[in-house]
Amino acid sequence: MHPLRTAKLLLLLALSACGFQKSLPEESLNQLYSTPLSPPERPLRVFHLGHSLVNRNMPVMLEQLAGNGHDHRSQLGWGATLQSHWEPDVPINGFEQENAHPRYQDAHEAVRSGRFDAVVLTEMVEIREAIKYFDSPKYLRLWAREARTHRPDTRVYLYETWHQLDDAEGWLQRVDKDLGRYWEGELLAKGLAHGDTGGPVYVIPAGQVMARFVRRLEQAPGLPGLSSRSELFVRNPDGTQDNIHLNDLGNYIVALTHYAVLYQRNPVGLPFRLKRADGTDADSPDEATARVMQEVVWEVVTTYPKTGVAQRP
């Protein structure tokens, strides 16, 4: 082998051993999203892959918002990583409990079937631990490539989430910073760097929507029926605050965000009295508060090109 080629090979091996991964520069990453997607012409079949921040209720709420014809399946776990969903020998915590419902479908089977118009992926949080220990960019790439190998026109999305309310860095601060430094700067920039995923992975920016809504909410005097961010999250059975899992009101915001991105439609005016997955009535926001939720969703989605939605002029 030529000495120069040998040196290059040795350098690549050394970088690989040090954890180096090819990464797109910010400008090149942004260029992937310069042309928006065309709006879907029919109801969608959506596959959700993730964990308890997807949960059973949110996709069912999305189905009600989208109306007749929309359908979904999912594979979930407790704090599940993209790696654990991909690798057959890596256990998925809470698999039996989270998937004990009629909408469960094996993830590989679903993606390989070509029957889904959209595949929505999300990663474990703490996101920096997922990146450090579970190779998030690699598995985002593998799932996107798998989906488009079996159906090239599949729309693949990354559902951006949030962190613990009591995060030491600050909840809003983490949501603000993590979009660029982790969701984009690690998962997208590295996961898409090889150019073999059949197109970009678009973003469902639920964390950004939650943050903007919380800022609107916590400006005095709040909104009808809500006064603080904690009221979007569930309470534990003993009455203490769950700092990461959403209640019905939080799930409604996230379902609206999915709707706006997937269907590229303004969610203002959509129903706000919905059912949970078990058929019971979900807790509903006040009508005026629901309107603000819907407006915030559309503001965020149409000012963030990585959603694939046409942006505001």
Model-derived features: positions:
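Sec-dependent signal peptide recognition
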Residues: R5-L12
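Soluble non-cytosolic domains of exported or imported proteins
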Residues: P40, S52-R56, Y133-K138, Q173-K177, ...
